Amino acid sequence: MSFASETKKELTHMDVSDSDAKVELAAFIRMNGAISFSNQLVIMDVQTENAAIARRMYQLLKDLYEVPIELLVRRKMKLKKNNVYIVRLKSGTRGILEDLRILEPPMTFTKSIDRGFVKKRSAKRAYLRGAFLASGSVNNPETSSYHLEIFSVYEEHNEAICALMNQFDLNARTLERKNGFITYLKEAEKITEFLSIIGATSALLHFEDVRIMRDMRNSVNRLVNCETANLNKTINAAVRQIDNIKYIQSTVGLEALPERLREIAALRIANEDVTLKELGEMLTTGQVSKSGINHRLRKLDQIAERLRSGETPSQVGLKVSNS
């Protein structure tokens, strides 16, 4: 079962007050309900491929309204042959839809969210929970980028969902898709806050555990990459230094160097693998700091480059014996 399915399954076990149950139903029916007319009856079908969600919608309707309710199961014949669960109302439909603020007399459907219906904070949470159960999804934090979204056919309703989410400072954004619109979250912290808002505590804890482990792994990888880069930089510098010292040795000889450069040059080519700190501790003339050693090696680099460019030893400041 996917992380999104596990999250929705958890939500279907939540106990809610009658007022919050109505708000949750309103969100779900507005997004997943369909109306048809037969023999002067207004028939409403609420459809989902999730059995646990179908049972919840059936139970909420049964607890709130004293009307006959059917629960049907059909099998999809295209693509994935999943079961489709249909909660069907054949009587009292108009009154229920008006009570849920989905329908206004005489027969006008509302595409947005009734502000008075979600005035309380618990009602806002309930509406977002119903919307997520209806058409929400959240990526598995273990295997992909952080992403949570809720799909809506109508732009007006999508904007209302986004505004509702942002009343909780979630930094939600909207985007148009091929067949509708989505409100989405990309920040891991905001996704955990949303899971808390809708009541998915277990999913939240799992998400946080995975996020912490991912952040730790990323930190370790960054540290290793940084250390590897620094090591490569050190190795490349040592190779360059030794190459330059050997060039000086083969052209004018190390004897032409000033004493403080001559000693470090000899130590460097004799101890290719040691650090600058260790080189500083090897000097017979007294220990020199790492920065001091680095300064002398840079001077040797400059001398080698000037000799390579055609300057004479005297121009570089070296004294070459004529004997």
Curated annotation (Swiss-Prot):
Q: Which UniProt keywords apply?
A: Cell cycle, Cell division, DNA-binding
Which cysteines are disulphide-bonded?
none
Which InterPro entries is this protein grouped with?
Homing_endonucl, Sporu_reg_WhiA_N_dom, Sporulation_regulator_WhiA, Sporulation_regulator_WhiA_C, WhiA_LAGLIDADG_dom
Q: Which GO terms describe its biological process?
A: cell division; regulation of sporulation
Residue ranges for the DNA-binding region feature of this UniProt entry? 275-309
Q: Which Pfam families match?
A: HTH_WhiA, LAGLIDADG_WhiA, WhiA_N
Q: Which GO terms describe its molecular function?
A: DNA binding
What PANTHER family does the record tag this protein with? CELL DIVISION PROTEIN WHIA-RELATED
Role according to the record: Involved in cell division and chromosome segregation.
Q: Which family does it belong to?
A: Belongs to the WhiA family.
Return the protein name. Probable cell division protein WhiA
